[in-house]
From Swiss-Prot:
InterPro entries according to UniProt: DnaJ_domain (IPR001623), J_dom_sf (IPR036869)
UniProt main location, coarse: mitochondrion
Residues in the Mitochondrial matrix compartment per record: 55-149
UniProt function note: Acts as an import component of the TIM23 translocase complex. Stimulates the ATPase activity of HSPA9. Negative regulator of the mitochondrial respiratory chain. Prevents mitochondrial hyperpolarization state and restricts mitochondrial generation of ATP.
Tissue-wise expression: Expressed at high levels in liver, heart, at moderate levels in kidney and, at very low levels, in lung (at protein level). High expression levels in testis. Highly expressed in CD8+ T-cells, but barely detectable in CD4+ T-cells (at protein level). Almost undetectable in B-cells.
PROSITE patterns named among the record's database cross-references: DNAJ_2
Protein's name according to its UniProt entry: DnaJ homolog subfamily C member 15
């Protein structure tokens, strides 16, 4: 296995610290490895920088498109719900919007709509007493107008 003070290749790999200085890796080999790693890290940083620059260039027009789309979505034509506060004196139109029925709806339809909304907004179940009073006011107004017709 060992001949004349030398070490076989298998043992040389195993006991590298016992190798004679001529058989050990040179400093130049170590520098090449570090240089390759440094080059790879540098290329990675450069790639990330170029990708970031490209993303920032694309972001400006993309931001305008996103803003325009958000404005279109929030327009009233896409919403099926009434947006706005309550009027001082409730009108027939506002009452029908609150209950979600037509102003000329019959008593049965008004009552079913009132029941459905009150189940969702009842103060005993965590709903707002103010909203419940407005819902009741809307029901009373529509029922009174349907009696008159």
């Amino acid at each position: 296995m060992a001949t004349g003070g030398g070490v076989t290749s298998r043992e040389g790999l195993r006991y590298a610290e016992y190798l004679p200085p001529s058989a050990q890796r040179s400093d130049a080999d170590i520098d090449h490895t570090a240089g390759r790693r440094l080059l790879a890290v540098g290329l990675g940083v450069a790639a990330v920088a170029f990708a970031g620059r490209y993303a920032f260039q694309i972001w400006k027009p993309l931001e305008q498109v996103i803003t325009a789309t958000a404005r279109k979505i929030s327009s009233p034509s896409f919403s099926s719900y009434y947006k706005g506060g309550f009027e001082q004196k409730m009108s027939k139109r506002e009452a029908s919007l609150i209950l979600g029925v037509s102003p000329s709806a019959g008593k049965a339809k008004i009552r079913t709509a009132h029941k459905r909304i009150m189940i969702l907004n009842h103060p005993d179940k965590g709903g707002s007493p103010y909203l419940a009073s407005k819902i009741n006011e809307a029901k009373d107004l529509l029922e009174a107008s349907s009696k008159a017709n």
